[in-house]
Amino acid sequence: MSTEKINLDIHKILTLLPHRYPILLVDRVLELEPHKGIKALKNVSINEPYFQGHFPKRPVMPGVLILEALAQAAALLTFSEEQPKDPENTLYYFVGIDGARFKRPVEPGDQLILNVTFERYIRGIWKFKAVAEVDGKVAAEAELMCTVKTTDVAP
Protein backbone atom coordinates (compact mmCIF):
# COMPACT_ATOMS: atom_id res chain seq x y z
CA MET A 1 0.00 0.00 0.00
CA SER A 2 2.48 2.72 1.00
CA THR A 3 3.53 5.53 3.28
CA GLU A 4 1.04 5.79 6.15
CA LYS A 5 0.23 2.32 7.46
CA ILE A 6 -2.64 2.02 9.89
CA ASN A 7 -3.20 -1.35 11.54
CA LEU A 8 -6.60 -2.13 13.10
CA ASP A 9 -7.14 -5.04 15.47
CA ILE A 10 -10.44 -6.81 16.05
CA HIS A 11 -11.45 -4.43 18.85
CA LYS A 12 -11.25 -1.39 16.56
CA ILE A 13 -12.98 -3.32 13.75
CA LEU A 14 -15.90 -4.03 16.10
CA THR A 15 -16.29 -0.30 16.77
CA LEU A 16 -16.42 0.49 13.02
CA LEU A 17 -18.58 -2.37 11.68
CA PRO A 18 -22.04 -3.45 12.86
CA HIS A 19 -21.38 -7.07 11.79
CA ARG A 20 -21.01 -9.80 14.40
CA TYR A 21 -20.59 -13.59 14.43
CA PRO A 22 -21.24 -15.46 12.20
CA ILE A 23 -21.09 -12.79 9.47
CA LEU A 24 -18.11 -10.67 10.62
CA LEU A 25 -15.56 -11.62 7.95
CA VAL A 26 -12.55 -9.39 8.70
CA ASP A 27 -10.19 -10.40 11.50
CA ARG A 28 -7.52 -7.71 11.17
CA VAL A 29 -6.53 -4.73 9.07
CA LEU A 30 -2.90 -5.08 8.05
CA GLU A 31 -2.58 -1.77 6.18
CA LEU A 32 -4.87 1.15 5.62
CA GLU A 33 -4.06 4.27 3.67
CA PRO A 34 -6.91 6.80 3.94
CA HIS A 35 -8.50 7.76 0.60
CA LYS A 36 -6.43 5.04 -1.16
CA GLY A 37 -6.84 1.47 -0.01
CA ILE A 38 -6.90 -1.23 2.62
CA LYS A 39 -5.30 -4.64 3.10
CA ALA A 40 -7.18 -6.84 5.56
CA LEU A 41 -7.10 -10.45 6.71
CA LYS A 42 -9.70 -13.18 7.18
CA ASN A 43 -8.47 -16.39 8.79
CA VAL A 44 -10.60 -19.15 7.28
CA SER A 45 -11.27 -21.81 9.92
CA ILE A 46 -12.97 -25.20 9.63
CA ASN A 47 -15.18 -23.89 12.47
CA GLU A 48 -16.98 -21.47 10.10
CA PRO A 49 -20.69 -22.40 10.19
CA TYR A 50 -21.08 -22.39 6.39
CA PHE A 51 -18.65 -25.31 5.99
CA GLN A 52 -21.26 -27.69 7.45
CA GLY A 53 -23.21 -27.48 4.21
CA HIS A 54 -20.76 -26.03 1.64
CA PHE A 55 -19.50 -28.71 1.11
CA PRO A 56 -19.24 -31.34 3.88
CA LYS A 57 -16.77 -33.60 2.04
CA ARG A 58 -14.73 -30.74 0.51
CA PRO A 59 -15.37 -27.51 2.39
CA VAL A 60 -15.12 -24.37 0.25
CA MET A 61 -15.88 -20.79 1.32
CA PRO A 62 -18.90 -19.56 -0.66
CA GLY A 63 -17.99 -16.96 -3.28
CA VAL A 64 -20.67 -14.57 -2.05
CA LEU A 65 -19.01 -14.57 1.38
CA ILE A 66 -15.65 -13.73 -0.19
CA LEU A 67 -17.38 -10.74 -1.81
CA GLU A 68 -18.97 -9.87 1.55
CA ALA A 69 -15.53 -9.96 3.21
CA LEU A 70 -14.23 -7.57 0.54
CA ALA A 71 -17.24 -5.28 1.11
CA GLN A 72 -16.56 -5.27 4.86
CA ALA A 73 -12.96 -4.25 4.15
CA ALA A 74 -14.33 -1.47 1.91
CA ALA A 75 -16.62 -0.37 4.76
CA LEU A 76 -13.63 -0.20 7.10
CA LEU A 77 -11.80 1.98 4.58
CA THR A 78 -14.83 4.27 4.26
CA PHE A 79 -15.57 4.46 8.01
CA SER A 80 -11.92 5.01 8.90
CA GLU A 81 -12.03 8.18 6.78
CA GLU A 82 -15.53 9.35 7.58
CA GLN A 83 -16.95 8.35 10.96
CA PRO A 84 -20.73 7.95 10.83
CA LYS A 85 -22.66 10.62 12.75
CA ASP A 86 -24.91 7.95 14.28
CA PRO A 87 -22.96 4.65 14.28
CA GLU A 88 -25.76 2.71 16.00
CA ASN A 89 -28.13 3.47 13.12
CA THR A 90 -25.69 3.50 10.19
CA LEU A 91 -25.39 0.59 7.75
CA TYR A 92 -23.13 0.00 4.77
CA TYR A 93 -24.87 -1.58 1.77
CA PHE A 94 -23.82 -3.17 -1.49
CA VAL A 95 -25.47 -1.36 -4.39
CA GLY A 96 -23.60 -3.15 -7.16
CA ILE A 97 -21.02 -5.76 -8.06
CA ASP A 98 -19.41 -5.76 -11.48
CA GLY A 99 -16.99 -8.21 -13.07
CA ALA A 100 -16.96 -10.71 -10.21
CA ARG A 101 -14.62 -13.60 -10.96
CA PHE A 102 -13.68 -16.57 -8.81
CA LYS A 103 -10.26 -17.99 -9.65
CA ARG A 104 -9.53 -20.59 -6.95
CA PRO A 105 -11.32 -22.17 -4.00
CA VAL A 106 -10.82 -20.79 -0.51
CA GLU A 107 -10.56 -23.64 1.98
CA PRO A 108 -10.22 -24.13 5.74
CA GLY A 109 -6.75 -23.13 6.90
CA ASP A 110 -6.35 -20.43 4.25
CA GLN A 111 -5.54 -16.84 5.10
CA LEU A 112 -7.66 -14.70 2.84
CA ILE A 113 -5.99 -11.35 2.11
CA LEU A 114 -8.52 -8.66 1.19
CA ASN A 115 -7.14 -5.84 -0.97
CA VAL A 116 -9.55 -2.99 -1.68
CA THR A 117 -8.61 0.16 -3.59
CA PHE A 118 -10.76 3.28 -3.68
CA GLU A 119 -11.64 4.34 -7.24
CA ARG A 120 -14.23 7.11 -6.91
CA TYR A 121 -17.13 8.62 -5.00
CA ILE A 122 -20.13 10.01 -6.90
CA ARG A 123 -23.59 10.92 -5.56
CA GLY A 124 -23.36 8.87 -2.39
CA ILE A 125 -21.84 5.78 -4.06
CA TRP A 126 -18.30 4.57 -3.38
CA LYS A 127 -16.66 2.43 -6.05
CA PHE A 128 -13.79 0.08 -5.26
CA LYS A 129 -11.53 -2.42 -7.02
CA ALA A 130 -11.41 -5.50 -4.80
CA VAL A 131 -9.13 -8.54 -4.94
CA ALA A 132 -9.03 -11.47 -2.50
CA GLU A 133 -5.85 -13.56 -2.46
CA VAL A 134 -4.58 -16.73 -0.85
CA ASP A 135 -0.83 -17.37 -0.83
CA GLY A 136 -0.30 -14.52 -3.31
CA LYS A 137 -2.75 -16.00 -5.83
CA VAL A 138 -6.03 -14.34 -6.77
CA ALA A 139 -9.03 -16.19 -5.34
CA ALA A 140 -11.67 -13.63 -6.34
CA GLU A 141 -11.93 -10.14 -7.79
CA ALA A 142 -14.70 -7.64 -8.47
CA GLU A 143 -15.64 -3.99 -8.67
CA LEU A 144 -17.82 -3.10 -5.69
CA MET A 145 -20.27 -0.23 -5.33
CA CYS A 146 -21.42 0.61 -1.82
CA THR A 147 -23.41 3.28 0.01
CA VAL A 148 -24.03 4.35 3.59
CA LYS A 149 -27.60 4.59 4.88
CA THR A 150 -28.96 5.71 8.21
CA THR A 151 -31.79 3.59 9.58
CA ASP A 152 -34.44 4.79 12.00
CA VAL A 153 -34.18 1.74 14.26
CA ALA A 154 -31.05 0.72 16.15
CA PRO A 155 -29.88 -2.85 15.44
Swiss-Prot record:
This is 3-hydroxyacyl-[acyl-carrier-protein] dehydratase FabZ. SUPFAM superfamilies: Thioesterase/thiol ester dehydrase-isomerase. It catalyses: a (3R)-hydroxyacyl-[ACP] = a (2E)-enoyl-[ACP] + H2O. It is found in: Cytoplasm. The keyword Lipid biosynthesis applies. HAMAP family: FabZ (MF_00406). Involved in unsaturated fatty acids biosynthesis. Catalyzes the dehydration of short chain beta-hydroxyacyl-ACPs and long chain saturated and unsaturated beta-hydroxyacyl-ACPs. The active site is at H54. Its EC number is 4.2.1.59. Keywords: Cytoplasm, Lipid A biosynthesis, Lipid biosynthesis, Lipid metabolism, Lyase.
